């Protein structure tokens, strides 16, 4: 979707008018910087977490991470509850391949929960079946279907109204085009009789497309699907329809009734009747998608050092599983369903996700080649809330930080992430959700080289200040 010039001018005028709020907000009452865990302590945990590899829902790396979170919270003196779920876990093994007559074609990644070919692969004539969303499936039976897509535009100028921007010299983008798969359902290809699907990225660089775990939280597709970059896809496109046969290999295992756990940690405050909730999810492919839980551990450590009598409200930390297995494991929705009494007591919620992100973008070079590079800036932190009181508190809390943040009101949808369900439950909620290109990428190093330890620590400090500011308001003021 193209954002019109008129809408862009309106958007720019609106955010420029709102940006100056709280240029130098006073420190919140009760904040004690010396109690915050050090940057080194937080980053050491981040490096350890990244070395676990992708923490897809319920896999061994994810289970190790969840155990670490539970034991860390217990060591800080918090009450810890573990809620167990089971589901049929699908996970790819080895590197997918495409081959034809001894020639190999590089595979960028696979479609999660798509299917499995076994080690021998599946072979069929290669045919081109169209570009998303217009496919011609009339001739795919018994064949390998090649399709392509362009990434979608998120029209932020339409979805959001800005409460405030930090730093105020920045202009919040009117739109975003992160690297996400646009084809969300392969079952029509399976129904039409195709034996495999090859999906080509058209407008994303090969480096950006590599290892993308997209789309996530989809039900089993029952047909193997793999991605290729635009250049490899162009070579395959030239072969499609010529009678050439290709073999696709995507090995995967399904573990029936695999266990996975949500962790709920509670730090009692002076009042048990009022709760501030700090939540995140624990499953994901890399160093940033699921690192919000490290932020919560740091915040729990900070607030546990403050005497209980000085903690106005109890803090509850739901760290949920199932963000990447939504059809089976309900993530924050399950927590809400299981804990109606806690939800009734919650006066505010802050969802913490995707910390420390630097901005990496594709850029078109001379000749049309697309390069992927670090822009030298921090990624935009999109902080979503329909609550004006909560927005004002965050706009003040972020002042002086390293964060590059847009605090926005989702007037036309776009409340992404784990905070949306809490907001729908009637809780004044901030969903803090930076959305870098590499958010769903699952390389061996977890994209940790794309993160900033300084930014991550600064963001955790912002959340600590935000909780203090929340506790400076009554429940009625927070709901105003």
Placement of each model-derived feature along the sequence:
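Metal-dependent peptidase/peptidase-like ectodomains
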Residues: 141, 273, 320-429
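Short helix-loop-beta-strand segments that form the rim/entrance of peptidase-like active sites
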Residues: 44, 303-328
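Noncatalytic luminal/extracellular "stalk/propeptide" segments of secretory-pathway proteins
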Residues: 35-39, 46-164
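N-terminal export signals
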Residues: 7-25
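Soluble metallo-hydrolase cores and metallopeptidase-like ectodomains found primarily
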Residues: 106-139, 213-290, 298-306
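His/Asp/Glu-rich mid-to-C-terminal helical/loop segments that flank catalytic regions of hydrolases
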Residues: 229, 437-480
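N-terminal capping segment at the start of a domain
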Residues: 27-60, 76, 83-85, 209-218, ...
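Secretory targeting signals
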Residues: 1-3
